Swiss-Prot record:
One of its GO terms (cellular component) is ribosome. The keyword tRNA-binding does not apply. This is Large ribosomal subunit protein bL33. One of its GO terms (molecular function) is structural constituent of ribosome. Pfam families: Ribosomal_L33. Keywords: Ribonucleoprotein, Ribosomal protein. Belongs to the bacterial ribosomal protein bL33 family. GO terms for biological process: translation. The keyword Glycoprotein does not apply.
Length: 52
């Protein structure tokens, strides 16, 4: 089952990206190094749940 998730910047707390993931195969939370347009640099983005 695919679940909608958001990727939240660890510095500015802004949700910059949204994506889906398979909840059955990937049980751990995502942490990706992505570009934050507000900070204008690459930061760690952590997974949060989005309201459907």
């Amino acid at each position: 089952m695919k679940v909608k998730i958001g990727l939240k910047c660890s510095d500015c707390e802004d949700i910059n990206y949204s994506t889906t993931k398979n909840a059955k195969t990937n049980t751990e939370k995502l942490e990706l190094n992505k570009f934050c347009p507000r900070e204008n640099k690459h930061t760690i983005h952590k997974e949060i749940k989005l309201k459907s």
